[in-house]
Every structure is written in C-alpha cells, then in structure tokens.
Amino acid sequence: MRKVMNSPDDGNGRRRFLQFSMAALASAAAPSSVWAFSKIQPIEDPLKSYPYRDWEDLYRKEWTWDSTGFITHSNGCVAGCAWRVFVKNGVPMREEQVSEYPQLPGVPDMNPRGCQKGAVYCSWSKQPDFLKYPLKRVGERGERKWKRISWDEAFTEIADKIIDTTVKRGPGNVCMPKRPFAVITSAGYSRLANLIGAIKPDVSSMTGDLYPGIQTVRMPARTVSTFDDWFTSDLILMWHKNPIVTRIPDAHFLTEARYNGARLVNISPDYNPSSVHADLHLPVTTGTDSHLAAAIVNVLIADKKYKADYLKEQTDLPFLVRTDNGKFLREKDFNKDGSDEVFYIWDSKSGKAVLAPGSMGSKDKTLKLGAVEPALEGTFDANGIEVTTVFARLKAEIAPYTPEATHKTTGIHPSVVRQLAGWIGDCKALRILDGYNNQKHFDGFQCGRLKILILTLIGHHGTTGSIDTTYEGWVLEGNKALGGVKGRPGRSVSMVLAQWVWGEQYRRSKAYFDDTELREQIGFGVDEMEALRKESEANGWMPNWQSIKDPVVYINAGINTFATSTGYQHLRENFLKRCELYVVVDFRLNSGAMYADIVLPAATNLEKLDIRETSSTRFIHAFGQPIKPMYDRRTDWQISVGLARKIQERARARGITRVDDPEIKSFIDFDKVYDEFTMNGAVEKDEDALRFVMEKSKALGPGSYEEVLKRGFVGVGPSAGKTGPVPADKPYRPFTVNVSEKVPYKTLTGRLQFYIDHDWYQRFGATVPKPQYGGGVLGPKKYPFVYNTPHTRWGVHSFARTDQWMLRHQRGEPDVRLNPAAMARKGIKDGDQVRIFNSSGEFFAMAKAWPGLPENMLFSEHGWEQYLYKNMTHYNSVNAELINPLELVGGYGHVKFAAGGFNPNRIFHETTVDVEKA
C-alpha cells in the first residue's frame, strides 16, 4: 500500500513540518525577508500619517457596525440579562453585556449580567438547525421529510382543523402548551387559547419545577428575593442547588456574601462545583432529604432554638386541634351555622379558646393578636372538646427523627447535623436556595414543608431571611389583561396528569416499578395512584380534561413536549395516536419538531420585540428587535395574530359563527376571533401589544416602553411585588408585609400553615411536615445505579446545547457521569461509549469520570436533543414516574389546583438503571 506522506502517523512528515516551520520563522526574522517586521513602522507621533498600516484598518473594519440594539436571552432561564447587539449589513455580528444597572446602597451591584450561553447567541443563531421557512411533513412522522409552504397555507390548514375538530367533537380538543418566557409572546398564545376554548397545560409540572409541598404552607410557593439579597445573609444553604454552574450571572453574590462573613453550606448527594466554595458539604443519600430536614427541626425544637412570639403570630402552630379526630377546632364545632374556615387558639391569659383572626373565614383580616397570649403547647378542654396545639402535634411526631436515628438513612453523621442545626439556630439571616431536583423525588413534597419550617422556626421568613424556590415574576396588570379574555377561561390542566393519560404513562410506570418493593416502602403501588387520580378528578379537585378530551390539534409553542417528559419514545408513540395535527412553533428544529405535521419558524431572540419579567432582578429586560425577522420567520405575536385572522376568515367563509361551550360556561365566536384577539386592531402590531402591557402595568407605566428600548432594561416600581412592595433602596424580599403590616397569608388559616387536616393527609400520615416514608430511591433494586438529570453549565435546557462553541467546551456529544470506582467495576474507561438501560428503555452516551458522585449514582446533564444520540435514543428514555397522592388534593382552602402552583409535580428521579460498555 502506498504510504501517504505527512499523515498524522508519519514521523518523517511531522519532522518535515517542524523543519519547515522553523525555517519560515527564521526567514521572517531575517532583515532581507519579505516578512520582515521592519516594514511595520512604530508610531512615534499619533498625529502624523504613516504608510503601510493598511493591515490595521482591515482589522478595525471587522469591528465596525451599522447599528446597535438590545436583547436578552431567557428561553428557560430565570435570570434576566441585558445585552447590546452590534449589527452590520442587517446581520447581528456580536453582542456584549450591558453594565449600566444602578447600584443599591450597601450591596454589590449587578453589573454586568450574562453568561457564556448568551455570549454565543449571535453565532448560534446562524447554525443550520435554526428555522427559516414554514414546513409541512411529506413523509411519515419522524421521517424528517418536508416541503416548504407559505404562511397562508400553514394557517389555513391549522385553522380549518381547529374549526372542524371543535364543531365535530366539541370544544376542548385543541391543546396549546407554551413556555416562551416573554410577556407578549406568552400572552398571545394564552389569549388565543382562551378565545377558542383550548386546553392550556401547566408545563412547570411537566418539567418537575413545581414546589407543591411549600404551596401548602404559603401562597405562592414559587417566589424569590432578588438575587442581590443573597449578600445580606449570614448563612446560606444551597439545598440541591448548584448556583456556581446554573446561576452564572448571580453567583458572585455568594462569593461576596462569604467575604461579608456568611457561611455557605451545600446539601447534595454529589460533590459539585458549588461544594468547592462551601464551608460545609453534606452528601445526603438520595431520597432522604426529608429525614435530614426532620433531624434539623428535631434539634431546633429540642434545644428551644425557635422564636415563640413569631410562631404564635405568623403560623398555625398555636391553632387548636381536636384529639378525638385530629381535625382543627372550628367555629362550626360549636355552632351549626358557624364557618368551616374560622379557627381557635388557646388564650393563656383568659384560660379559654378564642377565635383566631386572619383566617379565610374570619372577619378580622389581620394577624394582630391584641391582648391574646396564644399557648404553643398543652392539652385543654374547649367546652367539652379535648384539644391540643399544632405545635404539640408537630413536636411529638418529629421526636423520633433525631440526628442519631436518621444517621443510617441519610448518611450524615449526628455531629454534622447538630453543627448545622447550631449554625441555623444562631444565625441572623438564613437563606435557603431550594433547587429543583429535590421536588422531582417522591420525598420532595414533605421535604419542602420541612425546609420552610426550618426557616420559620427561627423567625426568619419574611424578616431577615427567605427560602428561594424559583422566580414567580412581577405583577404586571397589562400582561394579565392582554393574555386573558373576560368570560373565556380556557381549560387549564396538569401536564403530568395529561401525559399520564394521553401518553399512557400509568401503564409504563406499572410495568417498570416493582410493586412489592413499592408497597413495602410507601404503602401503596401504581394501581392505587391511578385510582386516586380518578377519585381526585371525580371530586373536582384536579381538572379532568385529559380524561374526557384528546389533543386532536396540538400547537406546541416554545417547548419540546417529548424531550422534557419521561419515557421519550413511549410518550411520543402513544400521544401521537390521539393527535391528528401536531404543530410546532420554534426558532429551531428541535427533536420534537421532527415528528410534527407543520413547523412554524418563530423569530429568534434577536428578531422579536418583547420584554422578559422575572423577579430574580428588579428589572424588566428588552427583546429590543435589533434586526427584523430574517428569511420567512415571524414573531410569536404575529403568529398568534395570523392564526386568529385565518380562523375568523375561514369561519366566515364556511358560515360558522358561535359554538357554545357549556363545560366552562363559555362560548367560541369563530367569526370574531381576530377582532377579539386584536381588540379590533388596537394590539395587532407587536409594538402596540407591548406598549399596551407596559402602560397598563402600575409598576411600569407611561414612558417605560421607550426607556426599555433605549437602555435594554427598566426598573419596576413598588407595586411589582406579589407578596409585598419592591423597596427603592434595598433588595426585594418576599412576604415582609405579613410581618411588618400583619397582613394575613393567602392560606386557609391566614398563617404559614403547617397542619393540613384534609382526609387524605390524615390517611397518609402527613398532617404535619415529616418524612412520608423510610427514605431512599423507589426504583427497582435490581438496577444498581440511581439515575439523575441535573442542569448543565453548557446550556439552559436545550438552549445553546447545539452551539458549536458550547460543544467545544465539553465532550461535544452527550455524556454520562460515573464514579471512577464504579467505572472500574464495570470495565468502563473515560471516553468509552456506554449503554444505559432498564426495562423502560435505553440510551447511549460517552462515559465521563466524575469523582464527586456516589458510587451508586449516574448523572446525565439534561437538554440534549434526541438526534445527538446513537440510534435516536434519549436520556429520558429510561425514566419512569410516580404520582404523590398528597399533590392530588383539592377543595381545601388554598390547597387546590393552581397552574404553576399546586398540582402533581413530575416525580421521575426515582429511576434506577444499569450501565455497560456499548
């Protein structure tokens, strides 16, 4: 065989290359060389003209631009960062962070904000996976055969299918999930869904990002301080939170807090990049966090580290509970006409039970106790009914969970638990950064209640501390006015329950989980979960649209339904059987779009006019549309406008007018959809819709539209806070008015509520916050590895996961992390291709050694597209999910279905797998 010279394996070729390189370098240095640097004249007088400097001009021209504008990158990110974009010849060339945020006194500033994913957006948006034109499927679903069509063709087909489906099968068989994370974008899809009576799934539950346990304690559960408030803390618990990786724009506040004297504690099964910066790392065993939290509560109560006066006023802990049936003592217990929402406390001064002010049924809407001195503990006689207090019940039920008793379960030594509890009891400002991961475990519901109990016992909730879950957003009345339609509520559902039915996830979970093991651990199996789901729907607690409707027309805007759910292939196959027209709206061809019937190209972040509101900063950020939509893209608002116009046009052409919708006491005026959507043309244009939102929002108001486009951001006013005013001179902290102004909480008792006497909570032994079961992962024990899919440094969900620069900063392909000792046992080396599998499915990825992981754990960072995997598998192919019955409850004061608040969260980190070399 002829040998090719200069090949990588040819030693002579390498030597010849090096010899040539050295000769060239020497030649360049020689005075007679044409490469001689003597030709480049030094500048001695900057006012004079020098020849032979054209090479510098060429370089300078690379950095010239025609115009600039502002954008933010927030598809799935809870931050909010202003970037200035430089445009040349109508093309975005680069962008840089804005560093003009005003500084508050006494805390570090927010300048600049951003991360590497935002920095590459101009480059990423030019890659071939970004959509240019509307597409229609011409092959089988998933075959990836398309033809280009016009917007009119696309809108006509979609509009006719919506009308046909509604007329023939009734309203509610159109489903419109959306999560575009921009105000008028989101409002547009909501408004259209409301006008046509469509189903609006809660996608936060789909991704497992709800905090339903905390929602039983306070309303809302999902809220945070502005991130600069971290600096004011002296003890910060990063509980299943990895902010060094996932909160890059804000991680500096943690470092600055440490310089200010704060302690950082990392609680996570793995030793991660945030652990490096912590003063204490607790490697809690997966699925046992509630036991650790219970042990901390145990110590705080036993050592009397709680603030009694705070608990008496701000919580339901002094409320009276009957000893005979475990129910709250209510007004109706003494008066048949009394309220079921008025409760009692024991007044130590008068020695009798008195009505507690501030509850849902109370006429006294205040937490002020006046001369009443509530008892925290004791057993009393209330007119012949024996009662005790919630605190007494809590103390008794938490007593078994000592640090010594929980040691074997959690893996955390008692001395470490007591050390941490001591720090908590003595600190002045506790901050709990509560990550998403814990909520994706069955253990997460009760653990959430226990975490907020820790903060509450020491009196820091609403005072000096906070438990930060995830952003809730600011109060923007204009946003609600644009997205809502009076008398047209649409249909909200839990996406978890919808996919449980439509995707037949119940059948999949039943096949995967070991029924005997499950019953031994939690007391019931998947069959009971399904029965309880049906009972909840029959009781009217959870919406039942998934049980009586089908997603015949499914318009998926800004999310990837299959990639963000369990059992990728299983869900897709079963879901699509019910779906006759599957439409995807996105700015890039994600893996879910490969199975679509029609794909609509949405404008990129660079091409849209919109704003992003998130309560992690005190600013609203602009999608300032530095360039107009390129190719045949349209903004999301114009897509909604165009579809509404076509629905009205086709309805009039076909003689279809009003369709009654008695199930939700509403109607659909098909022949007026466009007129109603645009408010008779008033908000047809993007700029009109955005101005409408901003000028009708008290926290923004007149002039804010011009300012946000001029600066890239605009500050919010005091009324923006959902649980209290936004102060002008310090960071925002939620729930302060409940303490300072004695405003009741939006709970049944009007307090931070830790006792739920609902029948189901009594049935499952969960009236007070305590571990729901013995702890540990619930997946089949025959698979040796616990499987987890944490957030990544190199993307925001799927955002930037295909960018060439982000891929070059990692392995360039999907990987899984394993402890080196586990790899050695399996005969796997770093870089090997491996197969991860269980009875639910399989996927293939590159093995990556990760010493910070426990030996029984396997991580695969999420966000990867299906088409990046061998055999088109996916990291969610192996997951299976469970439903916690406590999350199915409704009809109990504040504990009821709420999109983005309370409904079944996706519990899919109970999965176990095995791994082998591929």
From Swiss-Prot:
A matching Pfam family: Molydop_binding
PTM note: Predicted to be exported by the Tat system. The position of the signal peptide cleavage has been experimentally proven.
Temperature-dependent activity: Optimum temperature is 65 degrees Celsius (with reduced methyl viologen as the electron donor). Full activity is maintained up to 60 degrees Celsius, with activity falling to 25% at 70 degrees Celsius. Substituting tungsten for molybdenum at the active site of SerA decreases the overall stability of the SerABC complex, rendering the components less thermostable.
Gene3D superfamilies: 3.40.50.12440, ADC-like domains (2.20.25.90), Dimethylsulfoxide Reductase, domain 2 (3.40.228.10)
Annotated binding of Mo-bis(molybdopterin guanine dinucleotide), by residue: D209
GO molecular function, one term: 4 iron, 4 sulfur cluster binding
Cellular component terms (Gene Ontology): periplasmic space
Similarity-based family: Belongs to the prokaryotic molybdopterin-containing oxidoreductase family.
Subunit and partners: Heterotrimer of alpha (SerA), beta (SerB) and gamma (SerC) subunits.
Record protein name field: Selenate reductase subunit alpha
Organism: Thauera selenatis
